[in-house]
Amino acid sequence: MSERRRPRPHDRPAGPNPDVRDLQVETLCDAWYVLRRATFEHRQPDGSWRREAREAYDRGNGAVALLHDPVRDTILLVRQYRAPAHLNDHPDGMLLELPAGLLDEGEDATTAMRRELEEEVGHRIESLDRLWTLYMSPGSVTEHLTFFTGTYSGATRSREGGGAADEHEHLDVVEVLVSEAWDMVGRGEIVDAKTVLLLQHLLLSNVRR
């Protein structure tokens, strides 16, 4: 997932909730991403109100896509270093993932995903199927991720891929058979949740045909 631009924090007010009142938000850290603390009163099952606090990490919103070559039954992955994974039990931090990225301010998810696909895996994809927009870690992160699928072939190849040089991205593009990718999930070689989710969607779609 490209981290090319600092995303705009989510400053808009939260929607109404009859079980939450006096919601106040303070910024704890405003660096590349934004860390905030929300304090609020939360209605308890007995009708009483309890003051609570939660911290939320704001990194903008993102998009991810699975590109499938239906003729050869292959998909495109990228391998990149993920420091947080390396700090939490992953042996070397080098994760295999589907191409993904953050949305620029005011940018729609489809436009962002097309850009990321060309930068990361080197394919210009005009037609993407939008599946869902999901919160991946709603207990601590504000980000939601929009999921896409599409097809690729030799005709869609437009450049080398591997990430944007001016953003110091260093990605290895990896093409694998769908069956092998699923075996890699079972062996613990693919441990990225968004990648597993879209692989499952592809496999289920093939079963239904």
Set out the residue ranges of the language-model regions.
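Acidic, metal-coordinating catalytic segment for phosphate/diphosphate chemistry
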Residues: L28-R72, H86
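Unchanged
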Residues: E52, N61-V64, P99-V191
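Nudix hydrolase/Nudix homology domain
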Residues: S2-Q24, R79, P91-M94, E105, ...
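Conserved Nudix-box catalytic region and its N-terminal flanking loop in Nudix hydrolases
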Residues: S2-R6, R54-Y57, V71-R115, R157, ...
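Short loop segments at secondary-structure junctions
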Residues: R43-Q44, D69-R72, Y81, T151-A155, ...
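Short, charged, low-hydrophobicity "junction" segments
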Residues: R5-P16, W49-E52, E120-G122, E126
